[in-house]
Amino acid sequence: NETPAEDYRLAAKLGAVINLDDLTHVDFLERAIGYIPKKIGCRFNPGGTFSLGETREGFQVMDKPGDAKYGMTRAQIAEAFRLLKAKGAEEFGIHAFLASNTLSNEYYPALARMLFRLAAELQQETGCYITFIDLSGGVGIPYRPG
C-alpha cells in the first residue's frame, strides 16, 4: 500500500487516526506531516490462512492473510510500536482484516481474541499504551444465484 504523502497530510489535518500498513511508513509519515501523531494504529497480518470452515455459500472471498500485501508481522508491529513511541506516539491501536465474506458468527470473536491477546503481549513487551482495537470489515452478504 503506497499511501501518498498528501493523503497522510489530509488525514492529519482532519484529526483522523492513521493506521500504518508497513514498518517503512513510520519514517514516511513523519516526513510527510512533520511529526508522529499522539494516537496511531498499525495493521497486523498474522500470515497463513484464517478460516473458520466453509461459509454457507462454500467460500470466503479473501481468507489468506499470508498472501496479502498489507499489514505487519508480529515482529514488525512490535518494532513499529517501539519506533513510534520513541518518536512521540502515546496511544496505539491494532487493526487487522483477515477475511472477507465472513458469514460465520465465529469470525469476530476469533479475531478479537487474537488481537486482544496481541495487544496484551505488545503492551507488556514494548510499554506502549494500546487504547483501541479495530476489527475491520469483512462481513459477508448472502450471494445467491439469479
Where are these regions (language model features)?
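A conserved active-site cap/scaffold subdomain adjacent to cofactor or substrate pockets
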Residues: 139-146
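Structured binding elements
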Residues: 135
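Active-site-proximal beta-alpha core segment in soluble small-molecule metabolic enzymes
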Residues: 1-132
